[in-house]
């Protein structure tokens, strides 16, 4: 069975595996030590966020994390990428929030293109203060 469902505490280890692997792969322009060094803090903070997981056949293949209307990220397990997992997670977020804002690194054109296809528009450009990397602020608004 395939579904998008709320995060459960038992998902934490798998969600962290996906978070680290996805960040290392998609953001190879950021030193790996940044991601590995931040993993313990992320592990502590994730359960306080609004998380939705994509599960297929009893396995978590991806998740979306939000803080209010801020989409902190959509993370999909490598072999599951390109199969609609991210879109289903984003659809769940859109169903629950009339406005979504996110940041995406300029050097991650695949993610920026995904969000553009899904109706997000660039609202601003800036620099991520934690990594020093150029980033785009993108916004989506539900059409009424």
Regions found by a protein language model. Give the residues of each.
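A short helix-loop-beta-strand connector motif used in the catalytic cores of GNAT acetyltransferases and
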Residues: 41-53, 70
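Conserved GNAT-fold acetyl-CoA-binding loop/helix
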Residues: 12, 16-43
């Amino acid at each position: 069975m395939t579904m998008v469902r709320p995060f459960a505490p038992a998902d934490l280890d798998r969600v962290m595996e996906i978070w680290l692997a996805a960040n290392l792969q998609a953001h190879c322009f950021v030193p790996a030590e940044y991601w590995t060094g931040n993993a313990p803090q992320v592990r502590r903070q994730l359960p306080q966020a609004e998380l939705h997981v994509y599960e297929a056949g009893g396995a978590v293949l991806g998740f979306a994390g939000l803080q209010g209307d801020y989409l902190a990220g959509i993370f999909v397990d490598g072999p599951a990428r390109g199969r609609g997992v991210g879109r289903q997670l984003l659809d769940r977020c859109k169903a629950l929030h009339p406005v979504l804002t996110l940041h995406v690194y300029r050097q991650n054109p695949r993610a920026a293109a995904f969000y553009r296809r899904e109706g997000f528009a660039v609202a601003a450009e800036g620099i991520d203060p934690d990594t020093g990397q150029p980033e785009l602020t993108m916004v989506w608004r539900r059409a009424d």
